[in-house]
Amino acid sequence: MTDVDLAFDEQEYIPAVAQDADSGDVLMLAYVTEEALRKTRETGEAHYYSRSRDELWHKGGTSGHTQAVKEVRVDCDGDALLYIVDQTGGACHTGYESCFHRTVDGETVGEQVFDPDDVY
């Protein structure tokens, strides 16, 4: 499937960070299975694996807030991926541009770009 060895964990997941191709902002962290990575590469749109729902997940399949994957990179240990994406709409299901929209002190630092009640 790839030209490099990937180190999936014992549950057959590998973490994937999504990064905005234009701004460089980190948008989200999710998990990928071999099937999710294959679908991402086949379609050019981000696919992840929802551990809570135990199913393959096409990012934006419900909301329309898709991620067009420009490149997939792997870290030096082969145990993490970086999806460099063109994000349509917000990446976070809470309506924010990034899932990393809060500090550990509780301060909101991100921008809410849609109302989740209108989408889900």
From Swiss-Prot:
GO biological process assignments: L-histidine biosynthetic process
Highest taxon in the source lineage: Archaea
KW Cytoplasm (keyword) present: yes
GO CC terms, sorted: cytoplasm
Record flagged with keyword Amino-acid biosynthesis: yes
EC number assigned by the record: 3.5.4.19
Signal peptide: none
Family annotation (Gene3D superfamilies): Phosphoribosyl-AMP cyclohydrolase
Pathway recorded for this protein: Amino-acid biosynthesis; L-histidine biosynthesis; L-histidine from 5-phospho-alpha-D-ribose 1-diphosphate: step 3/9
GO molecular function annotation: magnesium ion binding; phosphoribosyl-AMP cyclohydrolase activity; zinc ion binding
Enzyme class: hydrolase
Cofactor note: Binds 1 Mg(2+) ion per subunit. Binds 1 zinc ion per subunit.
Positions contributing to Mg(2+) binding: 75, 77, 79
Cofactor entry: Mg(2+); Zn(2+)
Record-annotated disulphide pairs: none
Subcellular location: Cytoplasm
Binding site for Zn(2+): 76, 92, 99
Keywords assigned by UniProt, alphabetized: Amino-acid biosynthesis, Cytoplasm, Histidine biosynthesis, Hydrolase, Magnesium, Metal-binding, Zinc
Annotated catalysed reactions: 1-(5-phospho-beta-D-ribosyl)-5'-AMP + H2O = 1-(5-phospho-beta-D-ribosyl)-5-[(5-phospho-beta-D-ribosylamino)methylideneamino]imidazole-4-carboxamide
Protein family (similarity comment): Belongs to the PRA-CH family.
The protein's role, per its UniProt record: Catalyzes the hydrolysis of the adenine ring of phosphoribosyl-AMP.
Subunit-structure text: Homodimer.
Name assigned to this protein: Phosphoribosyl-AMP cyclohydrolase
